[in-house]
Amino acid sequence: MEGLESVYAQAMYGMTRESKIMEHQGSDLIWGGNELMARELCSSSSYHHQLINPNLSSCFMSDLGVLGEIQQQQHVGNRASSIDPSSLDCLLSATSNSNNTSTEDDEGISVLFSDCQTLWSFGGVSSAESENREITTETTTTIKPKPLKRNRGGDGGTTETTTTTTKPKSLKRNRGDETGSHFSLVHPQDDSEKGGFKLIYDENQSKSKKPRTEKERGGSSNISFQHSTCLSDNVEPDAEAIAQMKEMIYRAAAFRPVNFGLEIVEKPKRKNVKISTDPQTVAARQRRERISEKIRVLQTLVPGGTKMDTASMLDEAANYLKFLRAQVKALENLRPKLDQTNLSFSSAPTSFPLFHPSFLPLQNPNQIHHPEC
């Protein structure tokens, strides 16, 4: 009884499966611009129906006859006793047909997934070049069913194999200006290689860029030295102007009052520092203190010395000393001339008449004389 119920359940499942498949076959399947019509599917299902093993169906029918007699003897249900062997044969063929169609659908789905994988790999390659160039690609995948091949097994049964081929069209690229790098996409020839396309770098086309001519290089490297000669001519006036400015500063500084008194500088207080009493270290410290005091005095004498470091201040002090020596020599040369002028003034007459008409005071004519009382 349990075996009969299981067979009946499988038969009902096959009928529902066949009805769904027939409804699904009414719609067209479109992929890559090609249509798979329901006629081909119906022909394949009828072909599968013819390929059922007759020995297996006869054995199954004998078993069903025995089960029918047992069911009639036990009087269990009028529903199971009324099953016709021909209808069971149809149901069995439907189940086998549904199994074959399910395997065919699985093969079709695997083919579609492989095509999707190729398109995905191609999209990944093309997206890498879409930053600097506009790539227009036209790819169409055609699915052409080849004639069915029958492979006879050892048990007398036949199996069916279907093969599909995909033919991508050639890639077209709209190029503007040559940039020196060229890539090409090639479909792999070997079936063992998975994926979509290969990326090949073309070195011959990268060399097609025109090299720069020697004239252009020579023209770009020309340098005119006219401006540099003008700058070299202007160096001397700048040096003279600087010398004149320094001379003016030195003359202004020479008339300033000079204070040679040593300024008392507070020594910085150091914490946690032990001062050594060694005579050599004490002598070296005193020598450094004297040098620093003299440098401070020299900075006050040299114009602008307080705003300079020690090295530049010493250079400025040497220049200022040269200027002072030149001024001393110039004054020494002027001394005899001053002595001669003093002698000429001393030999001239210095006595003048006291009552000279020119020295008489002028009287006011409008002066009123009052009479004396």
From Swiss-Prot:
**Gene Ontology CC:** nucleus
Q: Extract one GO molecular function annotation from the record.
A: DNA-binding transcription factor activity
Cellular localization per UniProt = Nucleus
Record region (Disordered): 127-227
Tissue specificity is: Flowers.
Q: Give the bHLH domain ranges.
A: 275-324
Q: Which organism is it from?
A: Arabidopsis thaliana
State whether keyword Transcription applies.
Answer: yes
Q: Which GO terms describe its biological process?
A: regulation of DNA-templated transcription
Bias regions of kind Basic and acidic residues — which residues?
A: 188-218
Specify where it is mainly localized. Answer: nucleus
SUPFAM superfamilies (alphabetical):
HLH, helix-loop-helix DNA-binding domain
What assembly does the database describe for this protein? Homodimer.
Q: What is this protein called?
A: Transcription factor bHLH87
Q: Which UniProt keywords apply?
A: DNA-binding, Nucleus, Transcription, Transcription regulation
Q: Report the superkingdom from the record.
A: Eukaryota
